[in-house]
Amino acid sequence: TRPEELAITETELKNAETALDHAEKNLQETLLNSYTKADDAVRNQADQLFIEPRSGNPDLVFSLLDQNSYVEPDFDSTDGILIEVESRQIEKDLMVWVGKLNTASVAEVTVNLSKIKGFLDRLALITNALVEVIGLTQATIDDYRGAVATARADINTAINNLFTATEELNNAEASLALVRRELSLDQAGSLPQVILAQVAKVNQAKAKVAIIEAQITGGRIVAP
């Protein structure tokens, strides 16, 4: 391998190391942003549908049983209870998450986002089925649907961003490993050439010594 080829590979190595550093920082930033989006989706959007959502005993702001004269199929008596229980659990998850914000792994954040997505998807099924009744206007229903839609969009964005950042890191690690292997092969390939060059110099020196010895033997010294 020629020196200029080695120089090119060494430059590629530096670029790959820079790309990996960027990917690592981007992933860390994405993990932090995931919490921000999750917090906004739950506490600024979905919590509008609950009374005292952070109290440990949240209640929906509307009664699902009031809807059963108007919707098909009817809401089950446990639908409201289950979504309220899930809301309470999501609040607990967010509190745990923020406590380890700088150390949460990709796997942990992925699980958190997945839980919130499932919660919001089920909440959307409820709000999309709501109809106007006494104490619940269509404008209010539209507000609830809009809040849940915004929350779901936030979470989907967070999930997609995390996937992209993880893929970028994986690709950067693979690229760096490849360049390191190429550089190792290039350096190994240059070794025989270096040895041959040194051997040639040694042989050349030996030839000069042989000429001098022959001239001495002949009784005269002539500059080689």
Predicted regions and their residues:
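Long, amphipathic, heptad-repeat alpha-helical coiled-coil stalk/linker regions
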Residues: 16-169
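Extended amphipathic alpha-helical segments
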Residues: 2-26, 33, 157-223
